[in-house]
């Protein structure tokens, strides 16, 4: 469960572009990575809620928030939202690669909404995502 006693902080990491430091992606046995599909807002909301995000909001409210925030950008979701899915087609983890506006107007790449269902943590799903 997400420890809400730890204050929230944005973390900015920079990479020097040295490809030699990249590690291969190792997807845990029994999982595959897949991109967003129509209707995945339900999976996204369920995973985020199970990971402790969105506090007292219901699952339906969390899904509605997602649709309000990202619903008009479904084309971008198809290549910016990634799910870890078990062989029985259960989505157990999610992350999004998005962009944020910088103070100078530039677009800054952002990895956010990385979450794994509590029952599936510790299996390498988050690392693969």
Name every feature range the model reports, one short phrase each.
Residues 1-29:
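Acyl-donor-binding surface of acyltransferase catalytic domains
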Residues 113-116, 122-129:
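Conserved acetyl-CoA-binding loop-helix of GNAT-fold acetyltransferases
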Residues 44, 104-109, 120-124:
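Extended hydrophobic-aromatic, low-complexity segments
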Residues 18, 38, 102:
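Residues that form or immediately flank small-molecule/cofactor binding pockets and catalytic motifs
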Residues 49-116:
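A conserved beta-strand-loop-helix scaffold within acyl/acetyltransferase catalytic domains
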Residues 32-46:
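A short beta-loop-alpha structural element at the N-terminal edge
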